[in-house]
Amino acid sequence: MNNLVNLLDLDADALTAYCGELGEKPFRARQLQRWIHQFGASHFDAMTDLAKSLREKLATRAEIRSPAAISDHTSSDGTRKWLLDVGAGNAVETVYIPEDTRGTLCVSSQAGCAVNCRFCSTGKQGFSRNLSTGEIIGQLWMAEFAMRAQLGRGPKDERVISNVVMMGMGEPLLNYDAVVPAMRLMLDDNAYGLSRRRVTLSTSGVVPMMDRLSKDLPVALAVSLHASNDALRDVLVPLNRKYPLAELMAACRRYLEFAPRDFITFEYCMLDGVNDGVEHARELLKLVADVPCKFNLIPFNPFPESGLKRSNNEQIRRFAQVLMDAGIVTTIRKTRGDDIDAACGQLAGEVMDRTRLAERGKFGKITPLVPVADAGAPREARPA
């Protein structure tokens, strides 16, 4: 049995405490952290400014281990996707998205997902387990140095990865105790040194944990909205049955008191004939009237057995125009990496279905998609 401590699991405070257990002073923790997260060291003998006695001690008690890559694919548009082995037959995906002015890494927080959004292929895989802090920050550690080896650093010695979005597989706020320490490392000047504005957590709306995050580590927030009323969202995002839209909007307003940005980003997957009507856009205007926000419209990426279709471009433009005419900043996400199944909603792990009905049951049973004509029915009038 491996009893070595994985130092990727430790944020600054935990690493300082660990060094204390070894009889070392706090500055050793900062040295270790820089070697690991800024220089990509994976072996202690490379850490030449540490005392030889400490290096020998660490070699017998600790390790630096990120998930191993099963596959590594690069899209025609430069998007790069890694499939990572997290043990017991589970795999997660990490995606690097290059842009002219930044490089964004999409990080997974769970193996599978229990929320089971209707339009997301990851949810169809089911839920296996939460990732550890080391498995989460290990994705950034692995990707940063893989991309640096490929591209080098920028002309001003800037990092290849300038932004991180917790938008990969899983619901981050259902793995709070591992996600927050990982994000602390993303922000730490002795690690990755990202600003809170450059780290975005995307949630389907776990209201109590949104409130907790606002106090503990208020990074930029994106909310997977995808519907303009409770009847429709109950079906598209089953978590809505536990935390309906009124509660979610109130949580968004509370979060903005602490957020590094003065708006919430609402993500909205455009589904043909389901949630893409002009009437839905107008309903959204009423819903978010007192929530400073921007909208990111996401063309649906089809996958087998979804039973859904992508809205056509003209319908997406009409929908966006309603929002923009009301003064809401609205973007239409450019589909990236779809030729390697790295586009939004396609992160399914390329592994066998690991459906966990008990986990999904926490958010209510899955019902057939509500027809558009019925989507605005009062909650008490809808089918159970």
UniProtKB/Swiss-Prot annotation:
Enzyme Commission number(s) from the entry: 2.1.1.192
Keyword check for Iron: yes
InterPro entries: Aldolase_TIM, Methyltransferase_A, RlmN_N, RNA_MTrfase_RlmN, rRNA_lsu_MTrfase_RlmN/Cfr, rSAM
SUPFAM superfamilies from the UniProt entry: Radical SAM enzymes (SSF102114)
Active-site residues from the entry: 93, 344
Major localization listed first in the record, in broad terms: cytoplasm
Disulfide bond residue pairs: 106-344
GO cellular component entries: cytoplasm
Pfam family, one: Radical_SAM
GO BP terms, alphabetized: rRNA base methylation; tRNA methylation
Residues that hold [4Fe-4S] cluster according to the record: 113, 117, 120
Reactions this protein catalyses: adenosine(2503) in 23S rRNA + 2 reduced [2Fe-2S]-[ferredoxin] + 2 S-adenosyl-L-methionine = 2-methyladenosine(2503) in 23S rRNA + 5'-deoxyadenosine + L-methionine + 2 oxidized [2Fe-2S]-[ferredoxin] + S-adenosyl-L-homocysteine; adenosine(37) in tRNA + 2 reduced [2Fe-2S]-[ferredoxin] + 2 S-adenosyl-L-methionine = 2-methyladenosine(37) in tRNA + 5'-deoxyadenosine + L-methionine + 2 oxidized [2Fe-2S]-[ferredoxin] + S-adenosyl-L-homocysteine
UniProt entry keywords in alphabetical sequence: 4Fe-4S, Cytoplasm, Disulfide bond, Iron, Iron-sulfur, Metal-binding, Methyltransferase, rRNA processing, S-adenosyl-L-methionine, Transferase, tRNA processing
Residues noted as binding S-adenosyl-L-methionine in the record, renumbered to the chain: 170-171, 202, 224-226, 301
Cofactor note: Binds 1 [4Fe-4S] cluster. The cluster is coordinated with 3 cysteines and an exchangeable S-adenosyl-L-methionine.
Molecular function terms, GO-annotated: 4 iron, 4 sulfur cluster binding; metal ion binding; rRNA (adenine(2503)-C2-)-methyltransferase activity; rRNA binding; tRNA (adenine(37)-C2)-methyltransferase activity; tRNA binding
Taxonomic superkingdom: Bacteria
Required co-factors: [4Fe-4S] cluster
Keyword Transferase among UniProt keywords: yes
Note: Reaction proceeds by a ping-pong mechanism involving intermediate methylation of a conserved cysteine residue.
Function recorded in the entry: Specifically methylates position 2 of adenine 2503 in 23S rRNA and position 2 of adenine 37 in tRNAs. m2A2503 modification seems to play a crucial role in the proofreading step occurring at the peptidyl transferase center and thus would serve to optimize ribosomal fidelity.
Matching PANTHER family: 23S RRNA METHYLTRANSFERASE, RADICAL SAM CORE DOMAIN-CONTAINING PROTEIN
HAMAP family: RNA_methyltr_RlmN
Protein name: Dual-specificity RNA methyltransferase RlmN
